Structures are given as structure tokens and as C-alpha cells.
Design a protein with these regions (language model features):
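Bacterial N-terminal signal peptides that target proteins for export
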Residues: 1-11
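A general structural signal for short secondary-structure junctions and capping/turn motifs
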Residues: 4, 155-156
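Bacterial N-terminal signal peptides
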Residues: 9-19
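A broad helix-preferring feature
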Residues: 2, 19-22
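Extracytoplasmic c-type cytochrome modules immediately beyond a signal peptide or single-pass transmembrane anchor
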Residues: 23-143, 157-171
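The canonical Cys-X-X-Cys-His
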Residues: 143-154
Length: 171
């Protein structure tokens, strides 16, 4: 009788273990989560590129000001410190002013390669340290003559780099 009871308890423990493992297993991000992150990237990209263009216009008038790349990187750092998202400037010229702007992983290298072939957007969902993120990148081109002050040898329309975004998919 005791053996039968122990076997039954062991059986129940095993069932509970597997049931628990199944119910706590991490689900894939939903389409809604991915769509929300895409919209966030679109909004951030518009905001950051507008910021870069406006700062560049002011820098042209007063070169004593900090350049757009320096200010953008600082804004990106503050947003990450506040826990919102991660954004990085990436170099696509092969000769970055700052080596920190070189692509750091496969996604960023793939983005720069895609932009060199004429694409302007790339994305993928990645699991980083157990959490799902939308990784997205958008191309940065010289949009005004002012861009050529810091990017000599480039002209309006030339690819300069990218902004890489890492947006969490679950709250």
C-alpha cells in the first residue's frame, strides 16, 4: 500500500512539474508586441533624424556648438539609462570618427551591408539574455550640405551610417 501511495505521489509530482514547465514556458512575442515596437521605431526614427537635422542646421551657423553625432549619442545614452530602449549610431563609411560607431554584432553588420545595397530599413526579433527584442536599423544619409562639414568627401544623398534600435517586446 505504501509503495503504491509513493508511486502515485511521484506520478503526481512529475505531472505537476511538467504542467508547471509548460505553463511557465516563455511564449513567442505576439504580433501586437512586434507591431507596437515597429511603431515605436518609426516614431523614434522620425524624432531622432529631425533632431540630427536641426542640430546640424545650428552647427552650420555656429561651429562652436556640439555636432549632431555627439548630441545624439548623449540623448541615446540618457534614453537607455531611463530604461526606454537602446539606440546607437553606426558608421557605414568604413572610416568612423569614433570606433564605437563600428557595427558591434551580426545584426548591425547585416544592417550596414543591406544599406550599402540600397535598403533603408532592416529588422529582426532576437532573444537577448532571455528577453525578446525587436532589433531594427534605419539608414542615415547626408540630407543637407551641412552634413558634409563633418563628413568631407560625401555629398547629399550619400550613405553615412545608420541608427540601430533595440526595443523590448514584453513589458
Amino acid at each position: 500500500m505504501l509503495k503504491k501511495l509513493l508511486k502515485m505521489n511521484l506520478f503526481l509530482i512529475i505531472i505537476l512539474f511538467f504542467t508547471s514547465a509548460i505553463t511557465t514556458a516563455k511564449e513567442s512575442p505576439s504580433d501586437e508586441d512586434i507591431d507596437r515596437a515597429r511603431k515605436m521605431v518609426k516614431l523614434l526614427d522620425d524624432l531622432y533624424k529631425t533632431f540630427i537635422e536641426l542640430i546640424t542646421e545650428e552647427y552650420v551657423k555656429n561651429p562652436a556648438l556640439l555636432p549632431a553625432a555627439t548630441l545624439s549619442k548623449r540623448v541615446f545614452e540618457v534614453m537607455e539609462e531611463k530604461g526606454w530602449h537602446k539606440a546607437r549610431l553606426l558608421d557605414a563609411t568604413g572610416t568612423p570618427f569614433n570606433p564605437d560607431n563600428n557595427p558591434k554584432d551580426a545584426f548591425e553588420r547585416d544592417a550596414i551591408n543591406a544599406f550599402a545595397w540600397g535598403n533603408s530599413y532592416i529588422e529582426r526579433v532576437e532573444n537577448i539574455e532571455g528577453k525578446d527584442y525587436l532589433r531594427a536599423a534605419t539608414s542615415l544619409t547626408a540630407v543637407t550640405e551641412g552634413c558634409t562639414i563633418c563628413h568631407p568627401g560625401k555629398k547629399v544623398g550619400d550613405l553615412l551610417g545608420a541608427i540601430s534600435y533595440t526595443i523590448p517586446l514584453q513589458e
